[in-house]
Amino acid sequence: MKKKYRIKKNEEFQEVFKRGTSVANRQFVLYVLDKPEQLYFRIGLSVSKKIGKAVVRNRVKRYIRQVFHEERDRIEIGKDYVIIARMPVATMEYEEAKKSLLHVLRRANVFH
């Protein structure tokens, strides 16, 4: 995923947290912020050290990025998405994590 599609700066994360709307399930919290002037969507990932060691955290981040990559044609543009992973996702396989993340995305109405 190209750098322009990622949220990296703390100020950008804080803006999404403050002004965005959130949807959650047991594995993920999703914050969505409208950015109508943006011609693409951006994602920011937050995986706490509570989830596990670096190997586990990096695997969870790869899972999330892969879901967004596979679903990129269906996801609405002009929005910023911040995904926070919760503890149960650490022990999940990719297909389970994908199903859970898609559930959160559907609840947030991000598919067109």
Swiss-Prot record:
Listed GO MF terms: 3'-tRNA processing endoribonuclease activity; ribonuclease P activity; tRNA binding
Keywords annotated in UniProt: Endonuclease, Hydrolase, Nuclease, RNA-binding, tRNA processing
GO biological process: tRNA 5'-leader removal
The keyword Hydrolase is assigned to this record: yes
GO cellular component: ribonuclease P complex
Pfam families registered for this protein in UniProt: Ribonuclease_P (PF00825)
InterPro entries tied to this protein: Ribosomal_Su5_D2-typ_SF, Ribsml_uS5_D2-typ_fold_subgr, RNase_P, RNase_P_CS
Entry's EC annotation: 3.1.26.5
Reaction catalyzed: Endonucleolytic cleavage of RNA, removing 5'-extranucleotides from tRNA precursor
Enzyme class: hydrolase
SUPFAM superfamilies listed in its UniProt record: Ribosomal protein S5 domain 2-like (SSF54211)
Highest taxon listed in the record's lineage: Bacteria
PROSITE patterns: RIBONUCLEASE_P (PS00648)
Function: RNaseP catalyzes the removal of the 5'-leader sequence from pre-tRNA to produce the mature 5'-terminus. It can also cleave other RNA substrates such as 4.5S RNA. The protein component plays an auxiliary but essential role in vivo by binding to the 5'-leader sequence and broadening the substrate specificity of the ribozyme.
Family: Belongs to the RnpA family.
Subunit structure: Consists of a catalytic RNA component (M1 or rnpB) and a protein subunit.
Record's protein name: Ribonuclease P protein component
